[in-house]
Amino acid sequence: MTRGAWMCRQYDDGLKIWLAAPRENEKPFIDSERAQKWRLSLASLLFFTVLLSDHLWFCAEAKLTRTRDKEHHQQQQQQQQQQQQQQQQQQQQQQRQQQRQRQQQRQRQQEPSWPALLASMGESSPAAQAHRLLSASSSPTLPPSPGGGGGSKGNRGKNNRSRALFLGNSAKPVWRLETCYPQGASSGQCFTVESADAVCARNWSRGAAAGEEQSSRGSRPTPLWNLSDFYLSFCNSYTLWELFSGLSSPSTLNCSLDVVLTEGGEMTTCRQCIEAYQDYDHHAQEKYEEFESVLHKYLQSDEYSVKSCPEDCKIVYKAWLCSQYFEVTQFNCRKTIPCKQYCLEVQTRCPFILPDNDEVIYGGLSSFICTGLYETFLTNDEPECCDIRSEEQTAPRPKGTVDRRDSCPRTSLTVSSATRLCPGRLKLCVLVLILLHTVLTASAAQNSTGLGLGGLPTLEDNSTRED
């Protein structure tokens, strides 16, 4: 009993010694592991704060630059609006002055003058001739209508003045454009086709050959209209000369130059041809308005590209659309390119508009894709159009208008790069942080397992030694 009790005490003492020894040996391991974990957590926290601060600073700088660009763009728009208002006021003042001058001229013509009395009496004096020259110079430079002949001499000046905005007896005016297309009208006068009857009633010119024939005969050439002076309303880079010479059969009609230039020819054919051209022009305008509505609906921001903007996209899309409706060669161009190349310009300048469908994913595909360009080789029969890039760079600024070639909001490189790099930079930082955390945890786990396995044999050795 005594030996058994002593053995039990010895067992208890040995048990106490066996339990207490690993606790004393375990404290330094626990402290080192805790210190290592604290170091890892502090390192990861420091790394994350550095990356986050860099990200926030970069995005804040991009936001500041974006706001500056917007303010600058708004200031430019306000300045353009002020300039437009000033120009409108100047135009109104000029119109008022012209109206006053016309009224004064009418009053002077109504009042009897000595040269007019002498001319009515049959006497041709130098004063009468000078008065005729002055009255003729005050009339517009537009050529007269062939149907406007007849009547007294006093009514001819009024008819000529009325033709400044109206052709013939039509109620629809043929507005004169502010500037001609680059190297466009030969006479320097550009008009928009509005009334087919008024246009077909003109005495058309056959070109320089007719003028040489008349000069050789000794007769004075009568002022004639030129087909290259009349443009369409929407596709305003196409003249009637180009349409009649290239698109001679719109809607199964015979619209050749011989039909139009024939003196005393049928006006019905000419009117039908011009109306067919106007229908094509209206259809092109409707398609362009649909494209504008799509851009306005789906394009969230104008800053979709560094080199292009919506205005550039609309310009090339309009040129491509008109070239599809009017497959003719343009003559009045500084530089020509194949009309099919307009499609590539639209594809490169217009934005990518993805469909509103989450199930279908389009990876890097444009909403406007050119097809059929490389199936057939370009031949000499392909129509050629004006190069928009050279025309935009060298086109003169119209009078009374604001220069809109730089109207696209050009953002700085920091803004465009920040909008693309901020989300990607954040994802990269998070990925690096996760990889660093996994590597450190794996190394810590290996160290803890190595220490644990190294301590077990020492405990067994102690127990065997005590036995």
Curated annotation (Swiss-Prot):
Bilayer topology annotation: Multi-pass membrane protein
Keyword list, A-Z: Cell membrane, Disulfide bond, Glycoprotein, Membrane, Transmembrane, Transmembrane helix
Sites carrying sugar chains: 160, 226, 254, 462
Disulfide bonds: 200-270, 235-322, 255-270, 313-350, 333-386, 339-385, 343-370
Record-annotated membrane-spanning stretches: 40-60, 426-446
Family matches, as InterPro entries: NALCN_aux_factor_1/2 (IPR055288)
Residue ranges, compositional bias (Basic and acidic residues): 390-408
Any one GO cellular component localisation term in the record: plasma membrane
Annotated region described as Disordered, given as residue ranges: 121-161, 390-409
Location(s) in or outside the cell: Cell membrane
Assembly with partners or alone: Component of the NALCN channel complex. NALCN complex consists of NALCN and auxiliary subunits, UNC79, UNC80 and NACL1. These auxiliary subunits are essential for the NALCN channel function.
Protein family according to the UniProt entry: Belongs to the NALF family.
Function: Auxillary component of the NALCN sodium channel complex, a channel that regulates the resting membrane potential and controls neuronal excitability.
Protein name, as recorded: NALCN channel auxiliary factor 1
Origin species: Mus musculus (Mouse)
